[in-house]
């Protein structure tokens, strides 16, 4: 094989590697209820930072009641919108929260409507429907118009965020 053939072969292999389907490391799949069925939706993966605004509320982690809510932020996907249609979808998603238990990484981690999802995040975190509704209200009452998260000091949080696939 000549040097020019080796270069051509290498370029072909490089092109094939780039053309192969790859998962987007910036997207995470979350299972949410849309009121009719549970669907797998995509959300931008993020690790929200806390702002220090305190309000009450309890969340479970690793099967035990361990923490109180300690902060809220207004961070979310770059696609979060202050438009009324998105905010209306979030209100509809909130109204779909049932009196059940939601779990991060579980078959049902929250609810969705349109492009808005409300869900539990963190390692082995679970929350009741009442905690989900209270967190939603706290995020809104803290001035977050579109997306945001309520955080607990055990690494669990409830998030309102832009999603696709609901």
Go through each PLM region and give its residues.
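Mature secreted bioactive peptide module from preproproteins
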Residues: 64-166
């Amino acid at each position: 094989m000549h040097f020019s053939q080796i270069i051509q072969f290498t370029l072909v292999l490089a092109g094939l590697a780039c053309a192969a389907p790859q998962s987007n490391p910036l997207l995470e799949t979350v299972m949410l209820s849309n009121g009719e069925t549970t669907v797998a939706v995509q959300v931008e993966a993020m690790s929200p930072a806390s702002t220090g605004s305190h309000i009450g509320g309890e969340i479970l982690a690793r099967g035990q009641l361990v923490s109180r809510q300690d902060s809220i932020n207004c961070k979310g996907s770059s696609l979060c919108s202050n438009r009324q249609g998105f905010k209306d979808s979030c209100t509809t998603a909130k109204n779909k929260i049932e009196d059940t238990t939601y779990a991060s990484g579980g078959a049902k981690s929250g609810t969705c409507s349109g492009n808005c999802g409300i869900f539990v995040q963190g390692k082995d975190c679970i929350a009741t429907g009442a905690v989900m509704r209270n967190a939603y209200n706290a995020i809104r009452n803290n001035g977050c118009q579109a997306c945001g998260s309520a955080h607990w000091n055990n690494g669990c949080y409830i998030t309102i965020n832009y999603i696709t696939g609901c």
